[in-house]
Amino acid sequence: MLKEDENADIQVFESADQPSFLSCGIQSYLEDISSSLDDLHYASVDSYKAQGVNIHTNSTVTDLDTDNKTVVVEHQGQTATYSYDKLFLSPGGKPVTPPVDGIEKYKHVLFMRGRDWANQIKERMKDAKKAVVVGGGYIGIEAAEAFAKAGIDTTIVDVADRILNTYLDKEFTDILETNAQQHGLHFKGGETVKSISGNQNGEVTTVVTDKNEYDADTVLFAVGVEPATEWLKDKIDLGKKGIININHQQQTSAKDVYAGGDATLVPFAPVSEDRYIALATNSRRQGVVAAKNMLGKEMTMPRVSGTSGLQLFDYKFGQTGIHGTEIDNYDGNLGQTYVEELIRPQFMQDDTKIHMKIIYDKDTHRILGGQVMSKEDITASINTISVVISAGFTLEQLAVQDFFFQPDYDRPWHYLNVLAQQALGDTFGSDKMLF
């Protein structure tokens, strides 16, 4: 906003003691890659002030009056009222606390969200011997991998029957689970945690599910996030689970009030609907769109595909768009093709494979989603599939799309060409390449 209007009076209220903490970097801190949590901040109080922003830390917005255009802020036990011309809300999300008996009763029961929790987890890792991580999504496997690498006997427990079930299809997660087991990380799927018990010192000792009991001196819950919007009830329109209702210009139901981040939906590119996709990349785009519209310069939030990538032990993977598990919910005829392909020509004496899947409409051949995985870092190629989805490409277009060839990196038919060709059943000789 300041680039558009250098005289704008911008007040930022942050409930934490430091702004812009990147929770996605917690694993690097737990594994001693990042030496300090201070490294995991996208911005600082000083950097905000240097740009002319009035930043207020340890300040929680507790009330909103859209008629009089004011917010109430609590800081160190004192409250103050601020007026606004335009307001942007980004209350974010908070860890879901599942209905588990004993979850708030015992020591060493942790959540992986935010700077304070990161400190507690790192401190606990010094003494932990046996951990249970509840939740097999991105956050759960990041914590579990860090525990396992630290020599902690770690088990992931999830209600789903496989890890990362909302991100990757079974062909990929089967490989990841086997590889994780080889690194000492165990997975127990299809189980619901019912209770936690502990000893007379108030320390957790056991996790009880509907099927088993697991000894544990440390338990970490990572079962998702939910919008932190209770204080906005009856102030602006909220949807299911407290998600803030917005249009594609980031406007809420109240005049001059905009919103973005983990408390909102984003327009989904593969199909015409809005979805809850809590990613930092989406939040940044929403911030730009909101700022433009707040300044009277109309801009619409682009459709996104929920593109993301991660690493679990030996494998790097990326995913975007629709998954094969959505076949029953897709309004059409959903097709999916899984392919394993050598990355380089055989004469390079390198048998590294890439595992790939493409999701598409069987009738129109429009590409709707994709997944890639390898021991080599090919995750950036998922960005290509994301662009393809947004551009409305068909299998026929991707099958012959222009990619460079250099034997150090790929083959004459790029692996994404091969993926689309295999889906079409028209391989142009790519299935019989001698190199």
Could you tell me what each predicted segment is?
Residues 7-9, 51-75, 82, 150-246:
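A Rossmann-like FAD-binding core segment of flavoenzymes
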Residues 12, 111, 132-133:
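Hydrophobic Val/Ile/Leu positions in short beta-strands of Rossmann-like dinucleotide-binding domains
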Residues 40, 140-195, 281-283, 299-325:
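Rossmann-like dinucleotide-binding cores of NAD(P)H-dependent redox enzymes
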Residues 113-114, 134-139:
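Glycine-rich Rossmann-fold phosphate-binding loop(s) that bind the pyrophosphate
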